[in-house]
Structure formats: C-alpha cells, structure tokens
Design a protein with these regions (language model features):
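Short, functionally important secondary-structure microenvironments
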Residues: 1-257
C-alpha cells in the first residue's frame, strides 16, 4: 500500500508530466525509468526522466523537464543526424552549444522556469553533480569550461582568455541550429589546435544530445558512456502515459547520486 509521501510524489510527477506535454505543445510520451540520465528522444518524441533514490525537488524536476522540452521544441532531428554523419566526434561539442541555445529559448518562452533553473543548478552544485569538487577548473578543456559557465555561471570561478571569451560569446549568440553547428565546429577545430585530449581525460559530463541509431563508440574523449540509446534500460520503468515509442535520439543528463 502506498504511503502518503509516495502518493504525493506520484501526484506531483503526473502533474509535471502533463505540464511537460503542454509546454512541448504536442502529446509527447513521458516515462520514468531507473536510468542514470534524463533524455529526450527527438526522433520518437519520448521524454524520459530518472527515478532518483531520494525525492526530487520541484525545482530539479522543472530543470529536467524544461531542458528536455527545450529540445522537443527547438532541436531538429535531421540537423543533428546530418551533422554527426559528417563528423561523429562533434557530438559533445554540439551538445554543449545546443544546450546554451535551448535553455535560453525555453526560459524566454516560459519565464517562470528562470527561478526553478537557478535553484536547481544550486542543488546540483551542492551535490557535486558535475564532479568538480576537487578539480582545478582552469585545467579543463574549453568545451567543459563553456558547459560549466553557461549552466552554473558565477557558481564556478573560471577565467577565460580573450580568445576563449570570444568563443563563449558566440555560444550565447546562437539563434539557429545552423549557428550552433558552426560554433561547435569552431570549438572542435580550436581544441584540436590548442588542446591535447585522450581517453584518460575526465571531461565534465554535459546534458547530452544523442542519436541512438549510431552504435559506434565516440573516440573524442567526450564522456563516451553518456551517448547510449537507452535501449538497455531495465524493465522496471514506470510510464506515465500509454503512448508508444523507442529511444533512437536522446538528450541526457547525468544522475545525482
């Protein structure tokens, strides 16, 4: 028999699920799974949210849902697919730059999310979600610096060179997917010229945009394990609606444990 707390959590979950559908302006499928990351399948229109061991705050729930709805509204499947067919190693770079664009657009569209996003990122920082507690942030790659600065802002103390600041400003200025792709390619080329990365590098895990119909591992060192298609998830998933769908193209967020 469900406890009052469990019933309250289920009610909140259902309310947030319905809100996500309304925000996305379409009948997307919302599921809850025992997975380490949240993702949105932009091909099959499925939003999956992890089931945390502890209760998820309303603000964190809003961040997860708001971010994924941002991809539902603004990230083009064909654009992502084409870019990765051309160069698979762009995955991490495309993800970070696109996150900047869609989070800005979803906050502009739904101004009430601004406060939730701010509080949720505070919560993530308090739980060392990005794994930076004992890191020298100045030694991070440019793409990881951009990922942190654009998500948590002044909560991290990272200094950029004039050249790096120009690139960051370009990320903030992206309005279209084509601009995202161009800036991601610029960062990728800059990194090849100015940085050394290998499989031992520990990048800061971004909220990742996935193409599940790609099976090969990413060889760029950009957190390969965060690029799976979600098909190996255990059957303990809880689905809030009866809609059908797979998980070919996803956006993921790492777990808080």
């Amino acid at each position: 028999m469900a406890t009052s707390t469990e019933e309250t959590n289920m009610t909140t979950r259902n309310q947030k699920d319905q809100l996500a559908k309304l925000m996305a302006t379409e009948d997307i499928t919302v599921v809850h799974r025992k997975i380490p990351t949240a993702y949105f399948d932009i091909k099959n229109r499925i939003l999956a949210c992890p089931i945390f061991k502890e209760d998820m705050s309303n603000e964190l729930y809003d961040l997860f849902m708001g971010h994924e709805v941002g991809h539902a509204l603004y990230t083009p499947y064909e654009g992502v697919h084409s870019a990765l067919v051309e160069n698979k190693t762009l995955k991490g770079y495309l993800n970070v730059v696109e996150d900047v664009r869609i989070e800005r657009k979803i906050r502009d569209k739904f101004a009430g999310l601004r406060k939730s996003f701010y509080k949720a990122y505070n919560e993530l920082m308090e739980n060392d979600f990005f794994g930076i507690k004992d890191k020298d942030l100045q030694t991070l790659s440019l793409i990881d610096k951009i990922n942190l600065i654009t998500k948590v802002g002044s909560r991290v103390n990272i200094s950029l060179t004039d050249e790096e600041q120009v690139i960051l400003d370009k990320c903030y200025a992206c309005e279209t997917w084509e601009e995202v792709e161009a800036v991601a390619k610029e960062i990728y080329e800059w990194s090849k010229e100015n940085e050394t990365r290998d499989e031992t590098d520990e990048s800061i895990v971004p909220q990742t945009l996935e193409i599940g119909d790609e099976e090969e591992e990413d060889e760029d060192g950009m957190e390969e394990e965060s690029w799976g298609d979600g098909d190996d998830v255990e059957d303990e998933e809880e689905q809030s609606e009866s809609s059908k769908g797979g998980s070919d193209t996803e956006d993921t967020m790492p777990d808080l444990e």
